[in-house]
Amino acid sequence: MARRPLVMGNWKLNGSKAFTKELITGLKDELNAVSGCDVAIAPPVMYLAEAETALVSSDIALGTQNVDLNKQGAFTGDISTEMLKDFGVKYVIIGHSERRQYHHESDEFIAKKFGVLKDAGLVPVLCIGESEAENEAGKTEEVCARQIDAVMNTLGVEAFNGAVIAYEPIWAIGTGKSATPAQAQAVHAFIRGHIAKQSQAVAERVIIQYGGSVNDANAAELFTQPDIDGALVGGASLKASAFAVIVKAAAKAKN
């Protein structure tokens, strides 16, 4: 079954009102004639209004970088699924290593977020991946399986229908290091195979992105791999020209 690739930009803690408008204008110009690849951006939640307005008449989808479990009430500083939907958000990144590390989010907590997003009709982008120490100890598959099982064991394998997984080896995030295409493919194939133990149909449909210093120089080679269905892009998503190269590479490789 052919899977439609998804390239998503994670802006992290970057941007301003002016930057948001300028970058989206650039992306619309660069990607105007591109088809065959879904595209999304996840700006800081502060700039969702600017992004929603700037994305009018564009096929670029809006995402965000976090969500709370609660819909409303006395939860200071949090953002609900309903608030995100109010701005036209489609994709929500959860489980990013920076959230796991700095905010001590557990596999179980992330699985709850996954369920909340599914219930709200939003698309979870579940980040998984191992640290450098875990990689060197040969625990990559063990870590990825554990992080996926946290969702499957509580919500069932069918929860991955219409969801996205982003394999992001922690040692490659923002470091300039990247897994080789063959290394990334091996892990992506493992992830798909692990899900296939529960459901071959779900495994064949689920989008598995690669993330970890994806840029305009290495994207094309990564996308030649059969189980890499796009990318979750950090730093390179802050430049319209670089991000467009990545999107075009995915569209070309997968069509």
From Swiss-Prot:
Pathway: Carbohydrate biosynthesis; gluconeogenesis; Carbohydrate degradation; glycolysis; D-glyceraldehyde 3-phosphate from glycerone phosphate: step 1/1. It catalyses: D-glyceraldehyde 3-phosphate = dihydroxyacetone phosphate. It is found in: Cytoplasm. Its main location: cytoplasm. GO terms for biological process: gluconeogenesis; glyceraldehyde-3-phosphate biosynthetic process; glycerol catabolic process; glycolytic process. Homodimer. This is Triosephosphate isomerase. The gene is tpiA.
